[in-house]
Amino acid sequence: MEYLRIENDFPRISHSAVTLGKFDGIHRGHQKLVEKIIEQKQEGAQAVVLALGTASRTILTKEERCRILEEMGVDILLECPLTEKIRHMKAENFIKEILIGDLQVSYVAVGEDFRFGYERKGTPAMLKEFGKKYGFHTEVLPKKMDGRRKISSTFVREELNRGNMEKFRFLMGTDFSVEGIVEHGRGMGHKYLLPTTNLIPPVEKLMPPNGVYITVSHFRDRSYQGITNVG
């Protein structure tokens, strides 16, 4: 999979199937959108995820998002920060200049409450209208719900901040995980025959609250059951 961070101009991509959103955490709602663009690869389209905006603390790191999307079958991940140009671009111009002009879109998948463009005036209905005129198909997916609440990145963040790891697993479809750099300590665990590892997580990674968690650690193709103290 190709990863591109958009600093100025978008790349020229031919025949793309695109889904748009924040995608800071690839929860079950995002996964349905990604599955839709993957289906379009059978028609010769390139599956493109256009991630709009970035958060200072993310549910998934860039490396984690890239790995998950690549495993799902995505061809290109475009990360587009909300620059002055993007934030002030009218929705009509976003469709014409970026989706049609740069990405040569043939298919778009969005959620029913997706908004884009200046003052968030761009809607799924607008995408459908422009699609009829310019020759691309827009598929609008209903909200993925958990009871009466929409599954969203905000929902995932709230449950992670509460330390509700079972709910996190349900919303994301996978367990919480973290990769980091091992920092050597004073060797107290080794002294008492209780092996320990001090892991420094990425600074941008959103972590659960301080506390003790049952975990599985992976190292050199082996897995070790244990407990982890966060904090």
Indicate where each model-derived feature is located.
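Classical nucleotidyltransferase
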Residues: 88-195, 210, 218
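A glycine-rich helix N-cap at a beta->alpha junction
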Residues: 65-66, 70-81
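Residue-level signal for inorganic ion chemistry
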Residues: 27, 69, 108, 168, ...
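Phosphate/ribose-recognition catalytic cores of enzymes acting on nucleotide-derived substrates
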Residues: 185-231
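N-terminal catalytic cores of NTP/NDP-binding nucleotidyl/phosphoryl-transfer enzymes
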Residues: 9-63, 67
